[in-house]
Amino acid sequence: MTQKKESFFWTSYSDLMTSLFFVMLVLFILVIVLLHKRMEATETQLLEIKRVEQSTKDLSRDYFQYRPDYKKYVLTIQVRYPAGKSDLKDMITTDKDAQLRQLAAAGCEIRDFLKNHNENQYILIIEGQASKDNFLYNYELSYQRALGLMRFWIEDSNITFGNNCEILISGSGDGKLDTHSMRETSNEKENQRFLIHILHKNIFEHNENK
C-alpha cells in the first residue's frame, strides 16, 4: 500500500514538473518572439530617422546651413536689427529689397521641401535668437522676430506650407538664462538670426503607438 502511494506521488510529481517545464518553455519562446519584434521595430525606426535626416538635406545650401552638432538649420541670410526691434522693415541693411527677396526665397524652399515630401507629417519650428546687449527683453524679442518672419512668409509673400506641416514659433533669447541653446561665441552679432527645425512627426506618432 505504501509502495503504491509513493508510486502515485512520484508519478504526479513528474507530471507536475513536466507541465511546469512546458509552461516555462512557452514563456521563454514568447519572450524571445517579443524581443525580436521589438528589435525589428527599433531597427525600422532608426532607418526611418536616417531617411528623414537625409531627406532634409534637400534644403538649398544657398539659404540654409545644417549644424549636425545641434541638429538644426541656420538661415544663412544675414539679418541685423536695431536694439529692441523685431520688424523686418527695421532691418539694418544696404539693400532691404534684396534681403527680403532672399528671405522669401528661403520660405519657398521650405514650402517646396514639404510639398515634395507630402507623404510625411512634419513639425516646422521657426526659432528666433537675439544678441546680448542692454535690452532687458531679448527673450520676448527673439520670439517676436521669429513671428515676424513667419508673418512675412505667409502674409507678405503668400507662402502656404501645406497640410502636412504643423508650424511652431519660438524664441531662445540671448543666452543669459543659460538654456544651452545654440550660440556663436566669436561674434555676438552672429546670434541675431533664425534657426529652422524640421521634425518628422510620423516618428513621434510611431513611438506613441508602440
What are these regions (language model features)?
Residues 127-200:
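Periplasmic OmpA-like peptidoglycan-binding domain that tethers envelope proteins to the cell wall
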